[in-house]
Regions:
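N-terminal small-domain helix-loop-helix segment of the aminotransferase-like
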Residues: 2-104, 112
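Nucleotide-sugar-dependent glycosyltransferase donor-binding/catalytic pocket residues
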Residues: 45, 178, 182, 237
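Conserved core of the PLP fold type I
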Residues: 66-193, 207-226, 230
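Walker B catalytic acidic pair
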Residues: 204
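Glycine-rich "substrate-gating" loop/helix at the edge of Rossmann-like oxidoreductase active sites
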Residues: 7-11, 177, 235-238
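Generic enzyme active-site microenvironment
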Residues: 201, 232
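Short strand-loop junctions, especially beta-strand C-caps/beta-turns
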Residues: 41-43, 173, 234-235
Length: 238
């Protein structure tokens, strides 16, 4: 048996574990200080009443013969996919339930989706970025190109025609920068992906925080995105 030697290409520790450790060390040395945590997008407050009520109702349903059910469809319960389609319709995105897949979480999908692509594909990651983008591709042995974002471009770099990428990661609004692509700028990425025959893995986990009219909540608001993009969203940030 041969191990996957690509594990040796990973960093010694997961980024967020390092952040937790440094935070704990700082608080131990500076007791009483308030630290703003900008690491993992974890919840900060108790769940709202509506969510708690829905959870209780779902548990109660499992105790009654008329409402009990075992495994749900592998791509998600129909009522949930219908609700998601309705949500997207608010952004003028026409989506059928057959195009919606519900999983155990966005993080899992960002890794699982890679099983559809050959290991020889080149990956483009806009930095700074969620560590999962890089780590999962390193485990597959793929070449990863890092496209730095900085103050000069508003942390929103545009495509470089000299780069031939097959898989492109875009997170908008971005964590940790908070920058978000306008429709005009995101269209440039969509056009680039279609031109290069590439796939955009679009991380829309933070779309609920968008307030500007010219910033799309979904990449599918952009013409041409339906032929080059897979959007991964999460309702855990709402």
């Amino acid at each position: 048996m041969k191990p996957n030697m690509h594990y040796t290409e990973l960093k010694d520790t997961y980024l967020f574990n390092t952040i937790y450790r440094k935070t704990d060390e700082y608080l131990a040395a500076h007791p009483g200080e308030h630290v703003l945590k900008l690491g993992v997008g974890d919840v900060s407050y108790p769940l709202c009443k509506k969510v708690i009520e829905a959870l209780h109702e779902a548990v109660d349903d499992q105790s009654k013969i008329k409402t009990f059910h075992g495994y749900l469809p592998e791509h998600g319960a129909m009522f949930l996919r219908e609700a998601i389609a309705k949500y997207y319709s608010g952004w003028n995105v026409d989506m059928t339930t057959d195009e919606i897949f519900v999983s155990s979480g966005a993080c899992d999908d960002l890794g699982d989706l890679l099983e559809m692509f050959d290991r020889d594909n080149t990956v483009l990651v806009i930095e700074p970025a969620y560590p999962e983008y890089v780590d999962t591709n390193l485990l597959y042995g793929r070449k990863v190109i890092h496209l730095p974002a900085g103050e000069g471009d508003g942390f929103l770099p545009l495509p470089d025609e000299s780069i031939d990428a097959d898989i492109i990661y875009i997170c908008s609004p971005n964590n940790p920068t908070g920058s978000a692509y306008t429709r005009e700028k995101l269209k440039k990425w969509v056009d680039y992906a279609n031109e290069k025959d590439a796939v955009i893995l679009y991380d829309a986990a933070y779309e609920i925080f968008i307030e500007e009219d010219d910033v799309p909540h979904s990449i599918y608001e952009i013409e041409g995105a339906d032929t080059c993009a897979v959007e991964v969203c999460s309702f855990s940030k709402t």
